[in-house]
Amino acid sequence: VTAPSAEKKTGSFERRIYMNNSAAFKCIECGREHHVGEVEYVCASCGGNLDVLYDYGRVRKQLSREGLATDGNFTMWRYRPLLPVEDSSPVPPLTVGWTPIYTCSQLAGRLGIKEVFIKDDGRNPTASFKDRPSALAVVKAREAGARIITTASSGNAGSALAGMCASVGMRSIIFVPAYAPAAKVAQLQIYGSTVVIVEGSYDQAYDLCIEASRRFGWYQRSTGYNPYTREGKKTAAFEIAEQLDWDAPDKVFVAVGDGNIMSGLWKGFNDLYRIGFIDRLPQMIGVQSETASAIVDAANGDGFVREGPAHTIADSINVGRPRDATAAVRAIRESGGCGVEVSDEQILAAIPALARETGVFAEPAAAAAYAGFLKLCQAGSLKHDDRVLVMVTGNGLKDIDSARRSVK
């Protein structure tokens, strides 16, 4: 995987014009374009991840900042013209998105930074960011006439999918590694999912899930395989911009596992830039555990992603073979951002630190983003006039054992 040497402030996502808002894909790896009906998940030529292409001229006619200002639909679906769903498609009834952004003036003053914002996606229905892509995946599965939908997950993606499926009466089958936190597995079972415990890593659970979906014809939601997960995740970027009065932050800190949240946020900001809703793009700062750092190493190094073992307390980013690595590395490098590695000790320390400074209770992976933010602050790498946003992707009750360890 090679990160491009493209200009810093323009996205790598293709901007071709098509008859419908979203009518084609482009492979992120080899560049081949596909019509929507031509492929279902990945590139037919190289197996690479696909990017959804939009007709931005058409979007501009359907979506405006003024229209959003009077729109009472405070969910991710308020941005429907920038989502790849049919106009007539019903969406899950759970309220996904429009999670709060907190302005942390006291924290900013103490750290000597202009503004610090916390976006708390732990406030979503199943308590994580992953409700966004799972809600969209359920819509696409129903459009395809699927009855069963599956995903591989360390917990949050599975919980999100299970909750969305329960809300519309669909069956879900979730593949999870044996080390997944008990609270997350319990959440799957509460929602009525069929849970397949894999005695192995997340990467092994992922491969088994893909093989099972091919064999049995289940609809596949897994990150870095289903191209629509990125589209659901980008809605957080739309909200960040709108909630900050269309003045994008200078830097966005986000924890990175497979890389799909990173690539989704970057695409979302680029979408808004393309339709003239924002006039500048933020720098994307990816944070990983030092024991699961394939994307950070590539972004800060030669651009090549090298797989390796992953062993971190932050289960949601415990990934040795990131499935959306190319797009994530590009997002960091094109935005002029960087990668940050943090230790498990720093991640654990960030859980109570974030809670005591802001009142936001984060699971380990979400706290990793805050740990990365603190690390750059302490290193003097942030400017006094920076406006910084930290993306909190999951609630601390998702992994209560780690929370207990963090305060011992």
Question: Where would I find each of the regions flagged by the language model?
Answer:
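Short amphipathic, helix-prone segments within low-complexity/disordered or flexible regions
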Residues: 3-7
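PLP-dependent amino-acid enzyme catalytic core
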Residues: 18-408
